[in-house]
Amino acid sequence: MKYLMVLLSSLIITLNASAEMIVISHPESEVDRLSKKQVIDLYMGRVQHFPNGGKASTLDMPTDSDHRAKFYKGLTGKTLPQINAYWARLIFAGRATPPQPVESSQEVIATIMKDTTAIGYIDKSELVDSVKVIAHVE
């Protein structure tokens, strides 16, 4: 019985660790879909505009959040310390502005609902009908 409990706990942790992150936007956003490369370019500060030329405002979770770790690992294969070091170099050199920090998935959704140029990421399990999914990150 004890072995079964350990096995089930491991399975649950594994399932939670592999949860899919989604990139969302305002339902009236002109952007319907972004490729993985386009999301990388936006979140790594390489571009500040959507492929259609419209301004993009990226939202980011707190520096130490599990959502942020899952998102960047799935998107770039990099760990949070690597992402933080990357941004520290860009900011120090004055070459880019990092995504706007927010405190929670609820704040991502609330900000997106007020700004048609904003995009953010949340866990797929937190998806609500009031936003549009424009990319998947596994």
Regions found by a protein language model. Give the residues of each.
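Positively charged n-region of N-terminal signal peptides that target proteins for export
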Residues: M1-L4
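N-terminal signal peptide c-region/cleavage motif recognized by signal peptidases
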Residues: T14-N16
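Exported/periplasmic ABC-transporter solute-binding proteins
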Residues: E20-E138
